[in-house]
Amino acid sequence: MKPHLKQWRQRMLFGIFAWGLLFLLIFIYFTDSNPAEPVPSSLSFLETRRLLPVQGKQRAIMGAAHEPSPPGGLDARQALPRAHPAGSFHAGPGDLQKWAQSQDGFEHKEFFSSQVGRKSQSAFYPEDDDYFFAAGQPGWHSHTQGTLGFPSPGEPGPREGAFPAAQVQRRRVKKRHRRQRRSHVLEEGDDGDRLYSSMSRAFLYRLWKGNVSSKMLNPRLQKAMKDYLTANKHGVRFRGKREAGLSRAQLLCQLRSRARVRTLDGTEAPFSALGWRRLVPAVPLSQLHPRGLRSCAVVMSAGAILNSSLGEEIDSHDAVLRFNSAPTRGYEKDVGNKTTIRIINSQILTNPSHHFIDSSLYKDVILVAWDPAPYSANLNLWYKKPDYNLFTPYIQHRQRNPNQPFYILHPKFIWQLWDIIQENTKEKIQPNPPSSGFIGILIMMSMCREVHVYEYIPSVRQTELCHYHELYYDAACTLGAYHPLLYEKLLVQRLNMGTQGDLHRKGKVVLPGFQAVHCPAPSPVIPHS
């Protein structure tokens, strides 16, 4: 009996020793990980987007794929105004002072690294000696894709059981090297679903200087651009020349002579036969302010405008243009509360979630609607098959509110703007209409002597947050996928007459209105004798 008891005790002691060794190895394994690093997830980009608590109403991003919002989503107004998503370029008072001490904002590298480096799980890849972020979803580390120092589902984790000490040490060394390598180089095998930070500090700096190209975009956006070029949904047949050699004065004169605002006036088929001549406003949009407006503001809906404290400055302008469903209530400190004109895409009129009929956002303001039409600007074809049927709600609204100025932009005006962008860009741009932002800028340039545009070209507060009033992140909202946004911004940057300080700190571009542009008279044609 005693020998059996002795063997049992030996086995028990051996088991205790084995379990103790196992727990020791597990403790060493996990304490080797850097606690400062965010824990990544193996979720793909699409899965990450589905898990985000997007605001209940549908996003009005023209051409974007819309996804149903999960029930019980967070209210953006509660979640956003004072939140700084990780990976965003938020600048506090101390940062702005540091920025002002630097001539171009990049003599002190810690200015940006303090904003991004510790907050976003980033990977970089080199492009023309610059490094671009491949970060996880800002502000949502638990939904971030990546393998920074942790095994992914495709990699085997540690086996259960005891490892020899030498093997454990080798694993620790390999793990540390792998983590360091992955934090600096983007793996070539990564697919296009990885969510990238919208831009690195180097890219933002080059955007301010007007020195970027589509080749510097992340692979996901590059693929989207190529797909749109291949699809050519609107049948674009560009026959002009692509060049970018015009000076600012020449470009302004080109815009003044060719980018003339035009709306449906009811005189063309099929609208003439439908009685639209009596339906549309009697006074054209271009003649609402015959004497012109002195100073105007165009306020983008970009998330970067949060925490800007620009509201008072914006409201000081004679007229303010806003976009789609962007609210002012609750955001007055950053965006102001004055609204003179509101540009709305056709989704606003057709999607019930925007409450176009009864929302106060669309009352007591000038409304300008638009819808993507064929490049040929064939009105009959467009009327039969619009992107979103804005014609029926337009008729209903005009009948109920005959005194409210409400216009639909003519497709020829929209595609004329696209032609000008393409003519002044060496690369092929997406064959899709310009964004509402670019359209709004040109409308205000036709009505005002000076136009101040806020957060079209992003400031140091640059973030992937698409809109300040919606909890939705995507780099495409800043750099473009459907719209040729990148090329629009480069064109506007060439026209900027404001200071670099305003561009950096406020995201503000100052443009002359067409009334203030003086162009040489065209040379008379001398007939041959």
Curated annotation (Swiss-Prot):
Role, per record: Transfers sialic acid from the donor of substrate CMP-sialic acid to galactose containing acceptor substrates. Has alpha-2,6-sialyltransferase activity toward oligosaccharides that have the Gal-beta-1,4-GlcNAc sequence at the non-reducing end of their carbohydrate groups, but it has weak or no activities toward glycoproteins and glycolipids.
Lumenal face of the membrane: 33-529
Compartmental location: Golgi apparatus, Golgi stack membrane
EC code: 2.4.3.1
Residue ranges, Cytoplasmic side: 1-11
Entry keyword annotation includes Glycoprotein: yes
Keyword Transferase listed: yes
InterPro entries associated with the record: Glyco_hydro/deAcase_b/a-brl, Glyco_trans_29, GT29-like_sf
Spans through the membrane: 12-32
Family: Belongs to the glycosyltransferase 29 family.
Pfam families assigned: Glyco_transf_29
Tissue specificity field: Weakly expressed in some tissues, such as small intestine, colon and fetal brain.
Catalytic reaction(s) noted: a beta-D-galactoside + CMP-N-acetyl-beta-neuraminate = an N-acetyl-alpha-neuraminyl-(2->6)-beta-D-galactosyl derivative + CMP + H(+)
Name by which UniProt lists this protein: Beta-galactoside alpha-2,6-sialyltransferase 2
Gene Ontology molecular function: beta-galactoside alpha-2,6-sialyltransferase activity
Induction annotation: By IL6/interleukin-6 and IL8//interleukin-8.
Modification note: O-glycosylated.
Domain of life: Eukaryota
